[in-house]
Curated annotation (Swiss-Prot):
A single MF term (Gene Ontology): protein-membrane adaptor activity
GO process terms (BP): tail-anchored membrane protein insertion into ER membrane
Protein name: Protein get1
Stored PANTHER family: GUIDED ENTRY OF TAIL-ANCHORED PROTEINS FACTOR 1, TAIL-ANCHORED PROTEIN INSERTION RECEPTOR WRB
Keywords assigned: Endoplasmic reticulum, Membrane, Transmembrane, Transmembrane helix, Transport
Chief place where the protein resides: endoplasmic reticulum
Residue numbers on the Cytoplasmic membrane side: 24-107, 170
Oligomer and partners: Interacts with get3.
InterPro entries: Get1, Get1_fungi, Helix_hairpin_bin_sf
One Pfam family this sequence matches: CHD5
Amino acid sequence: MDFLLFLFCLNLFIHLFDKYVKTFLVNQGFRVYARFSGSPEFKSYNDLRLQLLSTKRDLNNVSAQDEFAKWARLNRKFDQLNVKWEKQSKIVSQKSEGVKKLISLTFWIVTRGYRFIVQFKNSGNPVFAVPEGMLPTWALWFLALPKAKTGYVSVAVWNFASQKVISTLL
């Protein structure tokens, strides 16, 4: 019974982690990577963003009617910075997709890998017994796949069933 609850809680944890926590941790992991990687793409992206915001602030403080020459110069500078920033933004987004995929893959391997190891090591152990006469022989055989004795529910079948119940209910 303890093993049955352990497997159910493991599947519940993996489902809740994937649904609610994983995206947040992937984004935070990317932010940490971007801050401490020392990559010139991220540095120039942040520098351009700060220059763009500073120029936009200056542009908003200047009246277009009273100081047209200054406003036009700032507007041209803002447009040039905006074009550079958009180009740099595409580069950073491509790099961020790669880093986020790597972090997501790591989380997937850790969560699914642990479940796979538990399932593999306990593949011959039954989770619980099905009462005699409740199901036909072919159904008992199917529930015992891959290695449990006929008449018992295997770890693989229990994991599959608990995953489906959890994903349906949550």
